[in-house]
Design a protein with these regions (language model features):
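Soluble or luminal CAZymes and related metallo-dependent hydrolases
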Residues: 14, 39-47, 78, 82, ...
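SF2 helicase motor core recognition
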Residues: 22, 75, 113-116, 127-149, ...
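Short beta-strand segments
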Residues: 23, 64-71, 99-105, 127-131, ...
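Conserved helicase motor "Helicase C" RecA-like lobe of SF1/SF2 P-loop NTPases
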Residues: 71-104
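Conserved helicase ATPase core of P-loop NTP-dependent helicases/translocases
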Residues: 87, 96-131
Length: 196
C-alpha cells in the first residue's frame, strides 16, 4: 500500500522492483542472496530430479529435453545462476557434461545450427535457454520427450512459444511431457494467472 500511495521513494521501491524480486524469490532464494542455503524442496531441485529421471529412463532412445528459464541466465562471473546450478547438479548425478548445454553458448547462427543438430541427433540431451533465445526458430523437436518451464514468462504468447517447441510435427515421440514448476505462496501463482 505504501508503494501504491506514493509513500515510498520510487527509486528505492516500486512495483516493478517488487515484482522482479518476487519472481526471483519464487525461482530460487539464492537469487536474492547467494549466501542463503540451497533449499532441498525448491523447484530447481524438483526440476533436476525430473530431468535426471527422464534422462535415465530414455537413455536407449537418446531422447532430449528443453529447460526454459528467463531469469538467472548463465554467468561466468562467479555469481549464482540457476542455469549453472542445474547443469552442475545433473553432471554430479552422472549426466555427461557434453549432453547438457545452454543455448547462450551458441553465439552465432552457425554455432546455433550445429547445437540444434546435436539435439536432433540425441548428442545433446538437455538444452537450457530463455524464451527469447530458445523460442521461435528453435526446431529441435525430433527427439524431444519433455519440456520444463522453470519460471513463468510475462506474456501468454511466450508460454505458447515454449510449448510449440515440443508439440509439433517431426517429433518421433508419440507422447511428451510438459512440466511447469510453481513455488507455493509466491509470485508464481500471480504470474500464471496473468498469462492464462
Amino acid at each position: 500500500e505504501q508503494v501504491r500511495g506514493g509513500g515510498v521513494d520510487s527509486s528505492v521501491d516500486n512495483m516493478l522492483k517488487i515484482t522482479n524480486d518476487g519472481r526471483k524469490l519464487a525461482l530460487d532464494q539464492r537469487m536474492l542472496n547467494a549466501m542463503l542455503p540451497d533449499f532441498e524442496k525448491s523447484k530447481i531441485n524438483a526440476c533436476v530430479d525430473n530431468v535426471y529421471r527422464i534422462w535415465e529412463e530414455n537413455k536407449d532412445k537418446k531422447s532430449a529435453q528443453l529447460v526454459f528459464c528467463d531469469l538467472s541466465t548463465p554467468k561466468n562471473d562467479g555469481t549464482f545462476s540457476v542455469y549453472n546450478d542445474i547443469r552442475k547438479k545433473l553432471i554430479e548425478r552422472g549426466v555427461p557434461e557434453s549432453e547438457v548445454r545452454f543455448i547462450h553458448e551458441a553465439e552465432t547462427d552457425v554455432k546455433k545450427k550445429e547445437l540444434f543438430q546435436k539435439v536432433r541427433k540425441g548428442e545433446v540431451r538437455v538444452l537450457m535457454g530463455s524464451t527469447q533465445k530458445m523460442g521461435a526458430g528453435t526446431n529441435v523437436q525430433d527427439r524431444l520427450i519433455a519440456l520444463h518451464d522453470v519460471d513463468c514468462p510475462w506474456r501468454p504468447a511466450d508460454l505458447e512459444q515454449r510449448s510449440g517447441r515440443i508439440i509439433r510435427q517431426g517429433n518421433s515421440n508419440p507422447k511428451v511431457e510438459i512440466y511447469r514448476y510453481v513455488t507455493k505462496q509466491t509470485f508464481d501463482a500471480y504470474l500464471y494467472q496473468l498469462v492464462e
